[in-house]
Amino acid sequence: YIGYGLFRDAGVPAPRIGYATVAVNQEPYGLYVQVEAVSSDFLKRWYSKTEGNLYEGSFRDVVEWRELDLDSNQGRENRRDLRRLAKSIEKADDNNPWESLADYVDLGNFTRFIALEQLVNHWDGYTQTNNYRMYYNPETKKFEFFPHGADQLFQDVRGNIFRDQRGILSRALIQTDSGNQRYCQMMKQLLEQVWDESKIKSRIAETYRLIHPYIVTDLE
């Protein structure tokens, strides 16, 4: 709830979250989290064109273009967009691999996405080449990234915003001069415009008031 809210505040697509109590034949089954499905309706809220390919990364990096799950257009599967990205990474200039990807990846979106992953300590996301989604925006003809499976956030408050990256794109971002400069500028912008501690604490308190009675009931 808190983490996805921060992504949305920053303009990065992320599911909406709700809570519900479930009962079957009047037998209570407790409190559950409702996570918005990343469906065509979700894409319509964020994009003017929704016919692009939507991929899910699960312990696979973007260069493994045959292995990523395709969550849309399954009846007419075509991975040319992802294959082009993978080939561009293979051919990237060793001296400047980050900027050479600008024709295939929305660099602003990706930088914002990775910076937010570090801020909320989404250690199990693209940082580990896991739990991420990427959408090929037909309007810009570039890939955009957004979070997925963000259920282990804020676990290490001492986390380093320059932590090691397994993802080939995030390594190119953080470990090259031009990418690192862009990353630091984005981190500064997010800390000034999105990371509002009073607002975050207020959301936490609001959520606590909402679900605490039901958690107590579940534990009884």
Task: Label each residue range with its predicted role.
Residues Y1-E220:
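Phosphate/dinucleotide-binding and metal-coordinating scaffold of catalytic cores
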